[in-house]
Swiss-Prot record:
The chain crosses the membrane at residues 80-100, 117-139, 151-171, 195-215, 248-268, 291-311, 323-343. Belongs to the G-protein coupled receptor 1 family. This is Olfactory receptor 5AU1. Residues 1-79, 140-150, 216-247, 312-322 are extracellular. Residues 101-116, 172-194, 269-290, 344-362 are cytoplasmic. The gene is OR5AU1.
């Protein structure tokens, strides 16, 4: 009987609570009514619930990029400089990629790796520089939550892939100088393709872990990134939860990637140096060393800046230093790589002259 009575009263109860939630019921003005209450509108409850859920609401979230400078005149100057360097990066790496692709004389393992390096420089520079150019001229230097996550994923993927590819190029030089008679067997097309695919796989696996770890955190307050693109350390500093576990995980993976690549390079060049010193001819030693000069320069630039940037404690980060180093490995190195590998390489220059002569004759 009681159950039936409650069911019959449910419509009235729902109506009362609906009016309560909308703030439409007010206390009686009658003096006999001594009860008073305060109605909290449903909008306030919803707003409070959104705040309680945490700050990681991806819909509509934006990150404000602090950029390189706040001086408008300097921003316009940097826009011109960055645009010129980015154009040189695109043209230089595109020419190198196409030249190796169309020249039959360059279809060797060494140039296949160099072709992949040009592609990586083209790609990872393109994940950062276009957004930076837009922000130089924009009043609000913002990037969406998903845009920031996408930029970090592809940047980390291409940069880590390049780290492994440079190590593969060191192994290729070891095979060519220390085992010239077995070079075609050691660096067969299958092995070369495996090294390239392995570099990309390792790079994007690391990127998936890197990006997933950082963007699983909650971000609170002002989403101001103290950088000109979405990089790991500045984004981590915005989190409102404990990031120590994430930092340890990222440090382990970054350390493993850099340590494995660095050891491969050091062992390869130790064996190369040992072989060169045993050569009786001074001309032979010079020729062998000259084939490694461009690669050694690329190693010093890329690994020097990367080790400085990512294998430091968080407490030692300096905003000015980090921005300067980031400009070197995102803007300067991709410009220099095709120049270093082409200006000092006779095979590349011959192929370029041959292709250029063929085009002019047509």
């Amino acid at each position: 009987m009681t159950e039936f009575h409650l069911q019959s009263q449910m419509p009235s109860i729902r109506l009362i609570f609906r009016r309560l939630s909308l703030g439409r019921i007010k206390p009686s003005q009658s003096p006999r009514c001594s009860t008073s209450f305060m109605v909290v509108p449903s909008f306030s409850i919803a707003e409070h619930w959104r705040r309680m859920k945490g700050a990681n609401l991806s819909q509509g979230m934006e990150f404000e990029l602090l950029g390189l400078t706040t001086d408008p005149q300097l921003q316009r100057l940097l826009f011109v400089v960055f645009l010129g360097m980015y154009t040189a990066t695109l043209l230089g790496n595109l020419v190198m990629f196409l030249l190796i692709h169309v020249s039959a004389t360059l279809h060797t393992p060494m140039y296949s790796l160099l072709k992949s390096l040009s592609f990586l420089d083209f790609c990872y520079s393109s994940t950062v520089v276009p957004q930076t150019l837009v922000n130089f001229l924009a009043k609000r230097k913002v990037i969406s939550y998903f845009g920031c996550m996408t930029q970090m994923f592809f940047y980390a993927g291409f940069a880590t892939s390049e780290c492994y590819l440079i190590a593969a190029m060191a192994y290729d030089r070891y095979a060519a100088i220390c085992n010239p008679l077995l070079y075609s067997t050691i660096m067969s097309p299958e092995v070369c393709a495996s090294l390239i695919v392995g570099s990309y796989s390792a790079g994007f696996l690391n990127s998936l872990i890197h990006t997933g770890c950082i963007f699983s955190l909650k971000f609170c307050g002002a989403h101001v990134v103290t950088h000109f693109f979405c990089d790991g350390p500045p984004i981590l500093s915005l989190s409102c939860v404990d990031t120590s576990l994430c930092e340890i995980l990222l440090f382990i993976f970054a350390g493993f990637n850099l340590l494995s690549c660095t050891l491969t390079i050091l062992i390869s060049y130790f064996l190369i140096l040992n072989t060169i010193l045993k050569m009786s001819s001074a001309q032979g030693r010079f020729k062998a060393f000259s084939t490694c000069a461009s690669h050694l320069t690329a190693i010093c630039l890329f690994f020097g800046t990367t080790l400085f940037m990512y294998l430091r404690p968080r407490s030692s980060y300096s905003l000015t230093q980090d921005r300067t180093v980031a400009v070197i490995y995102t803007v300067v190195i991709p410009v220099l790589n095709p120049l270093m590998y082409s200006l000092r390489n006779k095979d590349v220059k011959k192929a370029l002259i041959k292709v250029w002569g063929r085009k002019t004759m047509e």
